[in-house]
């Protein structure tokens, strides 16, 4: 492969880190993956070790390049995509985090959001950020870190108030993209898509919002510079004396769901995709208009290229989909994710069983932080096959909840939906989704479109690809699933909504 050049993408996800290398045709030429530990200090709390994530990032880059016989000099650029909202704060001098990263799934700041609601401030937050105020986003996580991190972890002679150090500019806040850009280039930068998920960023003015910073007591000195998702000026370059041994431009970054939108070439208003990962996230490009939702969806930044207007998106965030399959493994109902398809096919129906996987509350369009996982309709005749099938159906039903809200807000009927993510390898799920949505499901040949989107953003910035049309030509269909065999879909969907109602407000304090 000597002489050829490529673009690399770091895909830092909830459960692990991947590095992929793509050629001009958008084909994968190298790929490596490493899991990291999920840390659960208390019920409802989820943390990651940011140093472990950085170590794994270096490992997968080395492993991918080695496996394909590539040198770092053959990379024209690196793009980054990441689990969004996950939040950390680190010491600028030592580069060490002051606490584990607080993961997007973490619910420790639920009470803070309820205080915001009680004070009547949610409408203002929603108007500025496009987000439904929730512990999911970064603002309350950053506030918690500044209030609760152990100052001894700063490894200074004066273990004093972290807030003082933050105000003095000695600490840095970031989502995972910022952490990786910092470690790769030494620069403190985020992109517009990740900034839009912090609940501190005004998506209309496209800047950090002073009123929100005051509300959550986050000093501006803590914050990164906000740059386009595809940046002709680059975020910086890797160090020739560092682990890569080459100066490679780091030129693109997008939150994982926006990266998938970009990788699916959803460049025009009305284009939509659904990504099935730990959670599921449906995004529809709304062009240069920030369409504010009246049906429980989020309005967010889709992407921005250098010198061009911001492209916005409507988003339906479903917290638990693929993680429900992992739960089946944890409960030893299946040995691996692939077995779920076989078991689901082995029964004609769920036999009246409905599973609402609200392990961390419910996202769009319900937004109930105190909803909890619920299985209804079981009898003595219920078998594991029924529960497995009900789990897959829950993914499709939750997606329909979001799709109906999206059609109402956008006034666009979904005639086709592009899908990606690990779960779309499951043909049963794709067909089930088509039936329940009564919509064509289109699966691309490259299903890891999140990494591809990050590569496209970086590659466009350095001229590896010149136009969006080149990227559209790269997009190839693997399989299309047309609706068939509805099996009382409307009745089943009605029963699903009843099951959701049973799950709501369960974890309330007596």
Curated annotation (Swiss-Prot):
This protein's record includes keyword Metal-binding: no
Enzyme class label: transferase
Catalytic activities: glycerol + ATP = sn-glycerol 3-phosphate + ADP + H(+)
Gene3D superfamilies reported in the protein's UniProt record: 3.30.420.40
E.C. code: 2.7.1.30
Keyword Transferase: yes
Swiss-Prot/TrEMBL induction comment: By glycerol. Not subjected to glucose catabolite repression.
Binding-site positions, ATP: 14-15, 278, 322, 422
Ligand binding (ADP): 14, 18, 278, 322, 422, 426
Binding positions for glycerol per the UniProt entry: 84-85, 136, 256-257
Pathway annotation from the record: Polyol metabolism; glycerol degradation via glycerol kinase pathway; sn-glycerol 3-phosphate from glycerol: step 1/1
Any one biological process term the GO annotation gives: glycerol catabolic process
Residues where sn-glycerol 3-phosphate binds: 14, 84-85, 136, 256
Molecular function in Gene Ontology: ATP binding; glycerol kinase activity
Entry keywords, A to Z: ATP-binding, Glycerol metabolism, Kinase, Nucleotide-binding, Transferase
UniProt note: phenotype after gene disruption: Incapable of growth on glycerol. Causes a reduction in growth on dihydroxyacetone.
One cellular component term from this protein's GO annotations in UniProt: cytosol
One matching Pfam family: FGGY_C
Role according to the record: Key enzyme in the regulation of glycerol uptake and metabolism. Catalyzes the phosphorylation of glycerol to yield sn-glycerol 3-phosphate. It also catalyzes the phosphorylation of dihydroxyacetone (DHA). Involved, together with the DHA kinase DhaKLM, in the metabolism of DHA.
Similarity comment: Belongs to the FGGY kinase family.
Protein name: Glycerol kinase
Organism field: Haloferax volcanii (strain ATCC 29605 / DSM 3757 / JCM 8879 / NBRC 14742 / NCIMB 2012 / VKM B-1768 / DS2)
Organism phylogeny: Archaea, Methanobacteriati, Methanobacteriota, Stenosarchaea group, Halobacteria
